[in-house]
Amino acid sequence: MRNIIYFILSLLFSFKGYALETINIEHGRADPTPIAVNKFNADSSADDVVGHDVVKVISNDLKLSGLFRPISSASFIEEKTGIEYKPLFAAWRQINASLLVNGEVKKLESGKLKISFILWDTLLEKQLAGEILEAPENLWRRAAHKIADKIYEKITGDAGYFDTKIVYVSESTSLPKIKRIALMDYDGANNKYLTNGKSLVLTPRFARSADKIFYVSYATKRRALVYEKDLKTGKESVVGDFSGISFAPRFSPDGRKAVMSIAKNGSTHIYEIDLATKRLHKLTDGFGINTSPSYSPDGKKIVYNSDRNGVPQLYIMNSDGSDVQRISFGGGSYTAPSWSPRGDYIAFTKITRGAEGKTFNIGIMKACPQDDENSERIITSGYLVESPCWSPNGRVIMFAKGWPSRAKAPGKNKIFAIDLTGHNEREIITPADASDPEWSGVLN
């Protein structure tokens, strides 16, 4: 994960006076900014192929964000490429490109790739950003994601999220159904399976770093084991044999503890485990079902859902179990809360019932709802939408979406992403059905 090394080339100009202004990605919906990602120069035909692929990945990343509109290269007027010259800005303005990316790819004697780029503002005719990245040849895609991250951050003011991974549960579409833990890039590329499908697996979670995952596996129908898998070495070990567990643990920001729900004696409660000593500490009490705990980014609070008042609602407590407060008050059942990495919002699944039956909704609410009684906002709904998780910059939510079975057509489940605003919903393509997504932090 540490194979990409950065060398700052130039970050010469601030946004003061920048004609496009910083894009606000939280409020409302703005037209995407037109950007031209020019051909990356290369010294050889092999490097030229890599350069072509890098341009495709950068363009796709920016397009998927919904904030940029890559312009087709067929409309480019200027024929010069590379980073050694100053662009003919009038030619780019003529095709309505507000931003321009030029770059080059070179293979070093070490065998690594050196990939350079410059981001230009064609309206003010100024350079906005530029970097040189070195990466092993097989990590060219990650280098492209890093470049897109830098462009996204420069224009929006928020960190990018393109150089990330998604772990999820893959399920075969044919009988017998086989469930496996799978790993892929955030955009669906580089999909690979981490388990063999011989046992039921559920709720994969990333550890504090993206180098390890944890998941629940049922060796038998009544015996649930929590496994830890090292993604670098492939080594797997049992964290614990927790009778009654239904979801994998979620980890504290410092990586020392984890929270999980365990059913015992007719009730389900939240427990915290010290990962070093494996000692369990019960955080909730009374009767009822308390599930789906999630830490706040600072580790001081835990959000979870509980039916202690008859219908599942969301609650927040201190990480030691004290000062319990209910935070959801709308009609319906609330489940699967997930705290934004920014700390400002909590995503959730809400189930409502009407004349046509149940409707599933993905929503967000402020983490301190007492500051705004109308803080809840539904961002998407459907037959089955569940398991929301956040991008590392807290601006995009990924979730599982399902459709019912029809005559001669089985139901299906896929992974989708949607912006915090409720716009730009898009499917993340997977080779089979998919559910229970979990988003990593930005890779090192």
From Swiss-Prot:
Q: Name one GO cellular component term.
A: periplasmic space
Q: Which domain of life is it from?
A: Bacteria
Q: Has UniProt tagged this entry with the keyword Cell division?
A: yes
Question: Which keywords does UniProt give here?
Answer: Cell cycle, Cell division, Periplasm, Signal
Q: Where in the cell is it found?
A: Periplasm
What Pfam families does its record include? PD40, TolB_N
The positions making up the signal sequence are: 1-19
State any GO BP term from the record: protein import
Instruction: Establish whether keyword DNA damage is in the entry.
Output: no
> Which SUPFAM superfamilies would you find in this protein's record?
TolB, N-terminal domain (SSF52964), Tricorn protease N-terminal domain (SSF69304)
InterPro entries membership: 6-blade_b-propeller_TolB-like, PD40, Tol-Pal_TolB, TolB_N
Any idea what job this protein has?
Part of the Tol-Pal system, which plays a role in outer membrane invagination during cell division and is important for maintaining outer membrane integrity.
Q: Can you tell me which family this protein belongs to? A: Belongs to the TolB family.
Known PANTHER family for this protein? PROTEIN TOLB, PROTEIN TOLB HOMOLOG
Q: How does it assemble?
A: The Tol-Pal system is composed of five core proteins: the inner membrane proteins TolA, TolQ and TolR, the periplasmic protein TolB and the outer membrane protein Pal. They form a network linking the inner and outer membranes and the peptidoglycan layer.
Q: What's this protein's name?
A: Tol-Pal system protein TolB
